[in-house]
Swiss-Prot record:
Residue span(s) of the pro-peptide: 43-244
Superkingdom, natural source: Eukaryota
Main subcellular location of this protein, as a coarse class: secreted
GO biological process, any: positive regulation of transcription by RNA polymerase II
Organism lineage string: Eukaryota, Metazoa, Ecdysozoa, Nematoda, Chromadorea
Membrane-spanning parts: none
Region annotated Disordered, chain positions: 231-259
UniProt gene name: dbl-1
Protein name (Swiss-Prot/TrEMBL): Protein dbl-1
Molecular function terms, GO-annotated: BMP receptor binding; cytokine activity; growth factor activity
Source organism: Caenorhabditis elegans
Record function comment: Ligand for the serine/threonine-protein kinase receptor type-1 sma-6 which activates a TGF-beta-like signaling pathway. Multifunctional protein that is involved in body size, male ectodermal patterning, innate immunity, lipid metabolism and neural plasticity. Dose-dependent regulator of body size, probably influencing the sizes of some or all cells rather than their number. Plays a role in patterning of male-specific genital sensilla (simple sense organs), known as rays, and mating-associated structures, spicules.
Family matches, as PROSITE patterns: TGF_BETA_1, TGF_BETA_2
Disulfide bond among keywords: yes
């Protein structure tokens, strides 16, 4: 292995351990405030510190403030969440403006809320979903054409897809990925519909603007991946993905069946978002098995402790010079991601995969 490859590998491993240490510190603080008696002031301070730490881990500066009437997460977003598509971000937008004229509908979407990550995100897929209906019983053939405006100033529009309406279903998906070849904070689509077809007005709308009943029938779903060269992404294995889906549906704590031991090991720890009063914006999961690492790293080091050579040497030196050399620590050695479905500001529904959220194994380091 050459020096450049060795250096890259070391940096990636170090960053992964740093993320694991950060998560462990946050979880231990959460554990302390959950079970340690404190004064009211100390408890409030610790709670705020835990929330700030978790928000930073989630890439947020503040809890998304929800204003106006609440909205329900549509079924197609629940389906995406349960499918484990292995994408970093999925965002769901409703149009901010709908203009109808004799030719069709103009739909405008505000994407500026995602601007904080625009420099390191790459759109991999974008889908415009339309719920359509015929305004009379006569069935006429025709096409639905989707155009997007590349330049707001010149109003130049380009067709990106056309579809027959001979077999009109409740929802029709249009691939509009081509509209995201450049980064933008606002995007507009023109929908050219046959005379006997229109966008459905949803009766069960919980918001009342645009009119929002029609906006709910024209969501834009954008899939994107982080494109940072230095980012360490951990793809969930099939086994991990299956267990995560089961945990989502069951919502129960997983109890470790291993025998109690003082040696370094993974132990149960469940994070309940309701305890943080985040149930208003985190839709799923309600909580998750984060696990934690506890136990000692003695000398001689048992083989099952998954210790590095450095930890073995450090343990030996600690036994000889305990005042000078600290013992190795029991820390996460392998972690897995967690997908969270939450409501961002301005009613943008987000699914995001966060790395290093669940401890899979522990060892001495």
């Amino acid at each position: 292995m050459n020096d450049s490859v060795r250096t890259t590998t070391t940096i990636s491993s170090t960053k992964s351990l740093v993320h694991s240490f950060q998560l462990s510190a946050i979880l231990h603080l959460f554990l302390l405030i959950s079970f340690t008696p404190m004064s009211a002031a100390a408890d409030q301070h610790a709670s705020h510190a835990t929330r700030r730490g978790l928000l930073r881990k989630l890439g947020l500066e503040h809890v998304p403030v929800q204003t106006g009437p609440s909205i329900d997460v549509p079924q197609h977003m629940w389906d995406i969440y349960d499918d484990d598509n292995d994408v970093d971000w999925v965002r769901h937008y409703y149009p901010k403006e709908i203009i109808e004229d004799n030719e069709g509908f103009l739909l405008s979407y505000n994407l500026s809320l995602a601007a904080r990550n625009a420099h390191n995100e790459e759109v991999t897929k974008a889908t415009l979903k339309l719920r359509l209906r015929r305004n009379n019983k006569a069935r006429r053939s025709g096409n639905i054409s989707i155009y997007f405006f590349e330049d707001d100033i010149n109003n130049d529009r380009f067709q990106i897809e056309s579809r027959s309406v001979d077999n009109l279903t409740e929802w029709i998906d249009f691939d509009v990925t081509a509209a995201f070849l450049r980064r933008t904070n606002r995007i507009s689509f023109f929908i050219d519909l046959p005379e006997d077809v229109e966008i459905e007005e949803t009766q069960s709308s919980s918001l009342s603007s645009l009119p929002y009943a029609r906006a709910q029938s024209a969501p834009l779903i954008v899939f994107s991946d982080l494109s940072e060269p230095s980012s360490v992404r951990r793809k969930r294995s099939a086994q991990t993905g299956n267990s995560e889906r089961k945990n989502r549906k069951k919502g129960r704590k997983h109890h470790n069946t291993e025998a109690e031991s003082n040696l370094c090991r993974r132990t149960d720890f469940y994070v309940d978002f309701d305890d943080l009063n985040w149930q208003d914006w985190i839709m799923a999961p309600k909580g998750y098995d984060a696990y934690q690492c506890q136990g000692s790293c003695p000398n001689p080091m048992p083989a099952q402790l998954n210790a590095t050579n450095h930890a073995i040497i450090q343990s030996l030196l600690h036994s000889l010079r305990p005042d000078e050399v600290p013992p190795p620590c029991c820390v996460p050695t392998e972690t897995s991601p967690l997908s969270i479905l939450y409501m961002d500001v301005d009613k943008v529904i987000v699914i995001r995969e966060y790395a290093d959220m669940r401890v899979e194994s522990c060892g001495c380091r």
